[in-house]
Amino acid sequence: MEIEVIASKRELQGTGASRRLRHAGKVPGIVYGGSTAPVQIELDHNALYHALRKEAFHASVLSLSVDGAKESVLLRDAQWHPYKQQVLHVDFQRVDKDHKIHVKVPLHFLNAEVSPGVKLGGGKPHHIVNELDVQCFPGSLPEFIEVDMGALEVGHSIHANDLVLPAGVELVAHVKQENPAVAVIHAPKGGVEETPAAPAA
């Protein structure tokens, strides 16, 4: 399901104008990328706040409507107030369906509770990273990537290159090369734990 974001062009710019916007329940933002000039926008704070709480909003191609004109974008940055539950600014990047995009996609960890390491060995699952950098065409962007921990023994880990990625999705070059561990089953306290194997060269 496509996620729609409603915005309007922001005519007044600068610190004072942004402060007044926030007092009025709006959030300043910008849309950039592609062959079109950057556009300053404003969005409803409450709608944006709730959208940002959803995982899919951060790893989906969004339909941004600016004064009724729609374009496909990715959320690239959201700045939050240091101690208030307030969004201060957002950045969106335009995407082209014919050009690959580079996105951080969240990981969903499955079946740890039925793994030999947990069920038989009494181990504790540990998630080392919660997202990975991938590249794909916009139409192939997954909301998340599954990490099946069901076969893990105590002390064993799953690495990035072990994951089954959706069709059309690949890890970016540096992640492929580094092949980081993404999850491990730690030995129970007092037990002997193997050191996770280093990724193959």
Curated annotation (Swiss-Prot):
GO terms for biological process: translation. Keywords: Ribonucleoprotein, Ribosomal protein, RNA-binding, rRNA-binding. GO terms for cellular component: cytosolic large ribosomal subunit. GO terms for molecular function: 5S rRNA binding; structural constituent of ribosome. Pfam families: Ribosomal_L25p, Ribosomal_TL5_C. CDD domains: Ribosomal_L25_TL5_CTC. Belongs to the bacterial ribosomal protein bL25 family. CTC subfamily. Part of the 50S ribosomal subunit; part of the 5S rRNA/L5/L18/L25 subcomplex. Contacts the 5S rRNA. Binds to the 5S rRNA independently of L5 and L18. This is one of the proteins that binds to the 5S RNA in the ribosome where it forms part of the central protuberance. This is Large ribosomal subunit protein bL25. It comes from Thiobacillus denitrificans (strain ATCC 25259 / T1).
